[in-house]
Swiss-Prot record:
<comment type="pathway">
    <text>Carbohydrate degradation; glycolysis; D-glyceraldehyde 3-phosphate and glycerone phosphate from D-glucose: step 4/4.</text>
</comment>
<feature type="binding site">
    <location>
        <position position="252"/>
    </location>
    <ligand>
        <name>Zn(2+) 1</name>
    </ligand>
</feature>
<feature type="binding site">
    <location>
        <position position="212"/>
    </location>
    <ligand>
        <name>Zn(2+) 1</name>
    </ligand>
</feature>
<dbReference type="GO" id="GO:0006096">
    <property type="term" value="P:glycolytic process"/>
</dbReference>
<feature type="binding site">
    <location>
        <position position="53"/>
    </location>
    <ligand>
        <name>D-glyceraldehyde 3-phosphate</name>
    </ligand>
</feature>
<keyword id="KW-0324">Glycolysis</keyword>
<feature type="binding site">
    <location>
        <begin position="274"/>
        <end position="277"/>
    </location>
    <ligand>
        <name>dihydroxyacetone phosphate</name>
    </ligand>
</feature>
<comment type="similarity">
    <text>Belongs to the class II fructose-bisphosphate aldolase family.</text>
</comment>
<comment type="function">
    <text>Catalyzes the aldol condensation of dihydroxyacetone phosphate (DHAP or glycerone-phosphate) with glyceraldehyde 3-phosphate (G3P) to form fructose 1,6-bisphosphate (FBP) in gluconeogenesis and the reverse reaction in glycolysis.</text>
</comment>
<dbReference type="GO" id="GO:0008270">
    <property type="term" value="F:zinc ion binding"/>
</dbReference>
<dbReference type="GO" id="GO:0005829">
    <property type="term" value="C:cytosol"/>
</dbReference>
<feature type="binding site">
    <location>
        <position position="96"/>
    </location>
    <ligand>
        <name>Zn(2+) 1</name>
    </ligand>
</feature>
<feature type="active site" description="Proton donor">
    <location>
        <position position="95"/>
    </location>
</feature>
<feature type="binding site">
    <location>
        <begin position="253"/>
        <end position="255"/>
    </location>
    <ligand>
        <name>dihydroxyacetone phosphate</name>
    </ligand>
</feature>
<feature type="binding site">
    <location>
        <position position="161"/>
    </location>
    <ligand>
        <name>Zn(2+) 2</name>
    </ligand>
</feature>
<keyword id="KW-0479">Metal-binding</keyword>
<keyword id="KW-0862">Zinc</keyword>
Length: 344
């Protein structure tokens, strides 16, 4: 299927909310990782989201260029073409973008999509993330207002983060002592500033103890009930029913999370979950095994010539793609999206 249109993306998110499941959002940095994501989604018969961080996009542009926008555009172009060969729907998203790089990433990408829409074409991306967790909440939401208006005009969904996700993402680190739990006051301020959809649809990355990176199970202290508290704040403020889920939540920093906590978060309106650390490991592990198992072949030692079949990048990149795709299927299972593609 072609990359999801804005209408299809909205339908995907609506179905996830109604069905109590979420889509894995897989961070990709190359054609190989994009292929792995598409393969995993297709084998799980799950729609999904492919996303590029600022660092991933810069990497995608090549060492000689190192340009976030050029890398994101190039990776998106590959994904648009590659997705046509698969029978599932996939949306393209850009991950964490902090204030200091907005002008180098999200703002120019929004402008590119607006130009496409003005020509009668579809936007290049279906959603973008603004990460204002490092600035005061009022400034965070003021910038969110600006970006949401631009996103709405280009038929794009905005993702907004309130609160701080611990750990490190693309070199940006949040200390454990930071505010890792979004407060009821911040939920209320969010509604006051950007509404609940009438000013443009947005996804909300509220924090409930999430931590980026790799941690042993049990070392991530999640409190999904924070998300329930956010929904309760919105219900009361908007006069909605007790079972309403007005916020579309995103789960960040889920590596090492207990399965039960993930399932609980789904009941509170999580419809997107970022997956990066686990798929990075899944991609790298078989490459390491290949190098150890073919040590004398991948290296030219003591005057020997090695084995071309062993050091041909295709020999180990195929294994990496397969392993990563299998880990993505596991994420689809965890998030209950298996077999629920809207393309059926």
């Amino acid at each position: 299927m072609p990359i999801a249109t804005p209408e299809v993306y909205n339908e995907m998110l609506d179905r996830a909310k109604e069905g109590g499941f979420a889509f894995p959002a897989i961070n990709c940095t190359s054609s190989e990782t994009i292929n792995a994501a598409l393969k995993g989604f297709a084998e799980a018969e799950s729609d999904g989201i492919i996303q590029f961080s600022t660092g991933g996009a810069e990497f995608g542009s090549g060492l000689a260029v190192k340009n976030k926008v050029k890398g994101a555009v190039a990776l998106a172009a590959f994904a648009h073409e590659a997705a046509k060969s698969y029978g599932i729907n996939v949306a393209l998203h850009t991950d964490h973008c902090q204030k200091e790089v907005l002008d180098e990433y999200v703002r120019p990408l929004l402008a590119i999509s607006q130009e496409r829409v003005d020509r009668g074409e579809l936007p290049l991306f279906q959603s973008h993330m603004w990460d204002g967790s490092a600035v005061p909440i009022d400034e965070n939401l003021e910038i969110a207002q600006e970006l949401l208006a631009k996103a709405k005009a280009a038929n794009i969904i905005l993702e907004v983060e309130i609160g701080v996700v611990g750990g490190e993402e693309d070199g940006v680190e949040a200390k454990a002592g930071a505010n890792l739990y979004t407060s009821p006051e911040d939920f209320e301020k969010t509604i006051d500033a950007i509404g609940t959809g009438e000013k443009g649809r947005y996804l909300l990355a509220a924090t409930f103890g999430n931590v980026h990176g790799v941690y042993k199970p049990g070392n991530v202290k999640l409190r999904p009930e924070v998300l329930l508290e956010g929904q309760q704040v919105a219900r009361k403020k908007l006069g909605l029913a007790d079972d309403a889920l007005p916020f579309d939540f995103v789960f960040h920093g889920g590596s090492g999370s207990e399965k039960e906590k993930i399932e609980e978060a789904l009941t509170y309106g999580v419809i997107k979950m970022n997956v990066d650390t686990d798929t990075q490991y899944a991609f790298t592990r078989p490459i390491v095994s290949h190098m150890f198992e073919n040590y004398n072949g991948v290296l030219k030692i003591d005057g020997e010539v090695g084995n071309k079949k062993a050091y041909d990048p295709r020999s180990y990149m195929k294994k990496a793609e397969q392993s990563m795709s299998e880990r993505i299927i596991e994420s689809c299972q965890d998030l209950k999206s298996v077999g629920k593609t809207t393309s059926k």
